[in-house]
Each structure stands twice: as structure tokens, then as C-alpha cells.
């Protein structure tokens, strides 16, 4: 079985209303690792999802959404805390900006006691804000380290400065989880935040020095690159398409 673990929230898109004092809200199940889990399941892989999931109505619907997409919910740890929310605004190019409501919420409360036996998994994917918000961050780092000898560990930082604006926290997390992971995936935006004075190739090489076998870098409309521990380098151009929004694009790449 494959496992993704971490965020469990709703992406909330505010819309216009006929009244200036009202807005419409369109909420969609989200969370970067959760999107990865659904992507893997849609590719035909037996997949589970690990998170602390709220017992509230949003958490119940989130679990049903996972089930309807073929993702096992046996690793969802029930929580009395609320479901996290992300308010999303899209610019003219379809790129999102985020405002998160996470404090005291279920997904970031995951504890070691709620984690399954790691030896049952072939591969484990983790990343995003759940790796920097405590106590979940420490839990996932511990879990990945426990699993690294029996499962492939894939890590995507998926930087969210609006949640944790301190660059040093993200850098320390990348160093810690990069030393555990067998595969890393970053976006060009992640690299620009983590190392603004480095090129993509320079930063990818610094990540390889942490220990992963492969480092993948996505660049939106510019395509993607992969760097290998033995000096390999490949690049793939992106097809030309009409973009409505880019939410979840990197997660889809990670799942594949």
C-alpha cells in the first residue's frame, strides 16, 4: 500500500454577490498531501491517507470524499478539533494566494500514537504545512524516519509563507526531511523562497547532498527538471494549454 500523510482542509473560494455586504463561498476538499493521495488512487495504486480528521461535518464529508476517490480512510485518526480552512484568491493568471485558518485544528494535531505501523507501506509521501506546524511536524518527521528503511519516502515542501513566514524554519525542515527522503519534489517558487540567491540547478545539487536519490523541480509553464545523485539531469517542456487555475498542479505531479 502507498500512503500520503499531512494536511486535511477545505479550500474556500470567495465569490461575488448581488449585495455589497455579502459574498458567496465555494468550498472544496483540499490539502496538498490529500490531493497526492487521490492522485495515486486514480492511477490505480492501493492508497491510504494519514491525518487527524475532525468529527465535524466538514471532516465527515472529507472522509467520504476520500472513500469516493478510492482512498482508504482506515488511517484517519478521529479528532474533536475543527477542520482547517484555506481561503483562496486567484489572480488573472489563475495563480492562487492563500489565507489559512489552522490554529487548534485537527490535521495539525496528529500525534505519534495515531500513526500506523510503517512497515506495511511501499511508499510514503509527505509535505506542505503539516511538516512545519506543531505537533504534527514532529510526528511526521518521526514517522518518516521510522519508515525510511522499509518504504520509499517522497517529500514535497510545498512552501506556504502565509502559514510560517520564517524562512529559517522551512530551511531547517527541508534539511531534516531531505536527509530522510529518497525523492524530493520542489517548485521553482519553493526554491525562490528557500534560496533566493541560488539557481534551480544549484539548489537541486544542495538538496542531493542531503541524501535523496532524485530531486524533481516543477516550473509551471516552463515544464520540469529532474536531477540525480549520479549526475543525471533531464528536462521536460510543459504542453501549451489554457489555464483556469493552478491549484493542485504540483500535487498531481507528485502523485504521478
Model-derived segments and spans:
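Structural motif
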Residues: 1-3, 122-123, 183
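Conserved beta-alpha-beta core of the PfkB/ribokinase-like small-molecule kinase fold
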Residues: 129-206, 222-223
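Structural alpha-helical scaffold elements that stabilize or flank donor/cofactor-binding regions
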Residues: 2, 116-117, 176-177, 208
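Conserved phosphate-binding/catalytic region of the ribokinase-like
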Residues: 1-3, 21, 146, 196-256
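Conserved N-terminal subdomain of the carbohydrate kinase-like
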Residues: 46-128, 153
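Glycine-rich phosphate/adenosyl-contacting loop at the front of the ribokinase-like
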Residues: 1-72, 243-244
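Short, conserved phosphate/pyrophosphate- and ester-handling motifs at nucleotide-, phospho-/glycolipid
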Residues: 40, 187, 250
Amino acid at each position: 500500500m502507498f500512503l500520503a500523510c499531512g494536511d486535511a482542509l477545505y479550500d474556500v473560494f470567495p465569490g461575488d454577490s448581488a449585495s455589497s455586504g455579502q459574498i458567496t463561498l465555494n468550498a472544496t476538499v483540499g490539502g496538498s498531501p490529500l490531493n497526492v493521495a487521490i492522485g495515486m488512487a486514480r492511477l490505480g495504486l492501493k492508497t491510504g491517507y494519514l491525518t487527524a480528521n475532525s468529527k465535524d461535518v466538514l471532516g465527515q464529508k472529507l472522509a467520504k470524499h476520500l472513500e469516493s476517490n478510492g482512498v482508504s480512510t482506515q488511517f484517519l485518526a478521529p479528532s474533536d478539533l475543527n477542520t482547517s480552512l484555506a481561503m483562496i484568491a486567484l489572480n488573472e493568471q489563475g495563480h492562487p494566494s492563500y489565507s489559512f485558518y489552522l490554529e487548534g485544528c485537527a490535521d495539525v494535531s496528529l500525534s505519534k500514537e495515531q500513526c500506523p505501523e510503517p512497515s506495511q507501506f511501499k511508499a510514503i509521501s509527505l509535505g506542505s504545512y503539516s511538516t512545519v506546524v506543531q505537533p504534527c511536524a514532529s510526528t511526521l518527521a518521526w514517522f518518516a524516519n521510522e519508515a525510511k528503511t522499509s518504504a520509499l519516502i517522497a517529500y514535497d515542501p510545498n512552501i506556504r509563507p502565509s502559514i510560517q513566514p520564517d524562512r529559517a524554519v522551512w530551511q531547517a525542515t527541508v534539511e531534516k526531511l531531505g536527509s530522510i527522503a529518497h525523492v524530493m519534489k520542489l517548485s521553482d517558487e519553493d526554491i525562490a523562497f528557500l534560496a533566493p540567491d541560488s539557481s534551480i540547478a544549484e539548489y537541486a545539487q544542495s538538496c542531493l547532498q542531503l541524501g535523496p536519490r532524485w530531486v524533481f523541480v516543477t516550473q509551471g509553464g516552463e515544464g520540469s527538471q529532474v536531477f540525480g545523485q549520479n549526475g543525471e539531469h533531464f528536462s521536460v517542456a510543459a504542453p501549451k494549454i489554457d489555464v483556469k487555475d493552478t491549484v493542485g498542479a504540483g500535487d498531481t505531479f507528485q502523485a504521478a
